């Protein structure tokens, strides 16, 4: 579990931003929202260049502005029902409006504490991590329930799948799955039965462990809903979807409701000018009047960053020289493929005048890149992206997206109206690591990607009015649907109505 609070180093990708966006929006509109998550004292990994473009790991520290907002509220000794010692933790509270985050820092045993020092460094002993996370979070929930009524507990991702088994039956639990990818469905932690004194269902994955006991299972886009029904057909009757959203106050930089396209165009020019200043200072490169095209997200195989590599490598000199490409993203620290891909981008960044790679991707760089580029590229392999929110952050600022046919793009983009699509939409989930057909799909998708990108650059250069119209359409059409208030109303509709009645 991660939550990318402002100033924190607990950021790895879209899930952390999503959870923090929920938190901030809920706190702002008066929803008594409680988020329980680990406090990782060493944050997440950060990356930088070294000699010969080597991608090296560096420390990513929490900002003092974030740490100063944490209040120590006590400690807990966590034991299983049998009395078996699980962990000692310190608890910290982070308050924003009506929302509250309770962050736990594991102190001992040392072997368990090490699993919670860095975000996503628990892979050497995943089962111990799952057991501790469930035992700690369930104890916190029970203590909260002793003083206030809990409307529902939403379990985010499979690593917390054991939590509902430790809660009283009168506490309603729901499960939200955030990825179709295999890493999101780890094998069952059968040792938990002995350690925690619980009985688990006869299933293979932690995802199924959660799906068995929770009364509802949410996916995070319509496409993800369709894919998940096929991956987990046993639980079709429990499945629903609520498409992800963003905190508009955190991500929308174009202020107010711009009614005319001329005012919109001026606002876009100001944002781009600001981003150009940042890029030129960071890179030392001249951008001039080139179209800025960005690819910004985790560097992982299914998101297909190699489409950018192919664009830079192949005989696309005419197209390449007409644009300035910005790439930013972090690979998982255990992902050797991702690290090598990042090193490839580093080499290109050193060699090419119109390409820049920023390795230390986080909230701050995303704030400028996603909102100030001319075009965003969204390239996941079809059926692999649960939702995606980068195109939402871009769209509400009038940045259109060239997207593969996956995730929430299918609900937001109308081709040639407020953005563009490329490639094919697959109906079945394909294991891209094991199925040879994936490379053939990649080849076809890339050819269409290149064709559509060339068309878009042509429009930008020769018919600027049409390009601005499409960008303006993105701004107008995205904003109502991607507002986090819509998501909160869908997840907690009954509660929010009750809250209104009491106010």
Residue ranges and their predicted role:
Residues 1-503:
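Catalytic cores of carbohydrate-active enzymes across secretory and cytosolic contexts
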């Amino acid at each position: 579990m991660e939550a990318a609070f402002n100033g924190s180093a607990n950021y790895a990708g879209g899930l952390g931003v999503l959870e923090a966006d929920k938190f901030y929006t809920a706190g702002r509109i008066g929803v008594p929202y409680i988020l329980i998550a680990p406090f990782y004292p060493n944050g997440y990994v950060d990356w930088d260049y070294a000699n010969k473009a080597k991608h090296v790991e560096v420390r990513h520290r929490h900002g003092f502005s974030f740490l100063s907002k944490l209040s120590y509220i006590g400690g807990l000794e966590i034991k299983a029902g049998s009395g078996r010692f699980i962990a000692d933790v310190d608890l910290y509270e982070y308050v924003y409006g009506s929302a509250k985050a309770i962050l736990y820092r594991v102190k001992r045993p040392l072997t368990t504490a090490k699993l919670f020092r860095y975000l996503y460094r628990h892979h050497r002993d995943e089962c111990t991590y799952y057991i501790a996370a469930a035992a700690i979070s369930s104890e916190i929930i029970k203590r909260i329930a002793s003083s206030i009524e809990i409307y529902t507990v939403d379990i985010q991702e499979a690593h917390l799948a054991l939590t509902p088994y430790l809660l009283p039956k009168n506490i309603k639990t729901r499960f939200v799955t955030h990825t179709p990818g295999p890493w999101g469905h780890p094998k069952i932690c059968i040792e938990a039965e002995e350690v925690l004194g619980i009985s688990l269902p006869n299933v293979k994955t932690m995802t199924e462990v959660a799906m068995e006991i929770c009364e509802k299972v949410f996916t995070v886009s319509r496409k993800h809903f369709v894919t998940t029904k096929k991956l987990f057909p046993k639980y079709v009757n429990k499945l629903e979807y609520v498409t992800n959203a963003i905190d508009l106050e955190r991500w929308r930089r174009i202020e107010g409701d711009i009614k005319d396209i001329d005012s919109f165009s001026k606002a876009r020019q100001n944002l781009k000018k600001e981003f150009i200043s940042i890029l030129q200072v960071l890179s030392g490169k001249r951008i001039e009047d080139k179209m800025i095209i960005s690819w910004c997200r985790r560097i992982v195989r299914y998101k297909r960053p190699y489409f950018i590599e192919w664009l830079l490598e192949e005989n696309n000199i005419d197209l390449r020289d007409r644009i300035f490409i910005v790439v930013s993203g972090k690979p998982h620290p255990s992902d050797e493929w991702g690290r090598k891909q990042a090193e490839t981008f580093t080499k290109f960044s050193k060699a090419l005048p119109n390409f820049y790679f920023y390795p230390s991707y986080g909230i701050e760089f995303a704030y400028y890149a996603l909102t100030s580029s001319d075009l965003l590229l969204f390239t996941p392999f079809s059926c692999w992206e649960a939702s995606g929110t980068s195109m939402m952050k871009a769209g509400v600022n009038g940045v259109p997206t060239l997207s593969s046919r996956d995730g929430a793009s299918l609900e937001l983009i109308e081709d040639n109206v407020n953005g563009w699509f490329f490639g094919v939409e697959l109906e079945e989930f394909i294991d891209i690591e094991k199925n040879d057909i994936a490379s053939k799909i990649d080849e076809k998708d890339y050819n269409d990607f290149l064709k559509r990108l060339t068309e878009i650059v042509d429009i930008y250069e020769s018919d600027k009015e049409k390009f601005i119209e499409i960008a303006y359409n993105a701004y107008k059409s995205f904003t109502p649907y991607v507002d986090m208030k819509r998501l909160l109303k869908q997840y907690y509709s009954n509660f929010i109505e009750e809250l209104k009645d009491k106010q």
